[in-house]
């Protein structure tokens, strides 16, 4: 077998898609059947403008919260907690038993810990020196 290893700083879409589809096909052999559902929970002001919310993926018994954001004028008013509580309330009847997420050291680790999340992992000095990335989960 005559194989050649390559490296690039300019990844092309064709190579990316080949790798992505390959790992997805492999994963599908080991994961239960089911569709990943995109979910969201939002906060709107009096004018109906979106001022915050969360987005994530629901798959079988789990939710991964990808993003939680509030406009800076609406922070420190309990809205983040309300969003997370609403998420739990809505997904638990769907059979969800665990919520997972990640956060950086400059974001909201203490917030999630106060909500009952448990830190289950950490990258140090990622994505830059002096910044950590934390992985959390909460069994509901």
Residue ranges and their predicted role:
Residues 100-102, 118-135:
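Conserved catalytic-core motifs of GNAT/GCN5-like acyltransferases
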Residues 64, 95-97, 116:
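Short loop/turn motifs at secondary-structure junctions
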Residues 60-62, 98, 133:
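A generic structural signal for beta-strand entry/edge sites
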Residues 91-104:
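Conserved GNAT acetyl-CoA-binding A-motif
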Residues 19, 112, 117:
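Conserved active-site tyrosine of GNAT-family acetyltransferases
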Residues 3-66, 71, 106, 123-125, ...:
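Acetyl-CoA-dependent GNAT
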Residues 76-89, 114:
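Conserved acetyl-CoA-binding loop-helix of GNAT-fold acetyltransferases
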């Amino acid at each position: 077998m005559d194989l050649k290893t390559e490296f690039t700083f300019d990844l092309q879409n064709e190579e990316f898609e080949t790798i992505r589809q390959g790992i997805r096909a492999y994963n599908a052999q080991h994961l239960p059947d089911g569709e990943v559902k995109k979910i969201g929970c939002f906060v709107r002001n009096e004018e109906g403008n979106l001022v915050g919310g969360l987005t994530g993926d629901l798959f079988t018994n789990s939710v991964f919260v990808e993003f939680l954001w509030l406009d800076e004028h609406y922070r420190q008013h309990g809205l983040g907690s309300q969003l997370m509580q609403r998420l739990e309330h809505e997904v638990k009847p769907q059979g969800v038993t665990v919520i997972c997420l990640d956060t950086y050291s400059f974001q909201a680790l203490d917030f999630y810990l106060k909500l009952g999340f448990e830190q289950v992992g950490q990258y140090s000095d990622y994505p830059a020196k002096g910044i950590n990335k934390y992985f959390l989960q909460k069994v509901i």
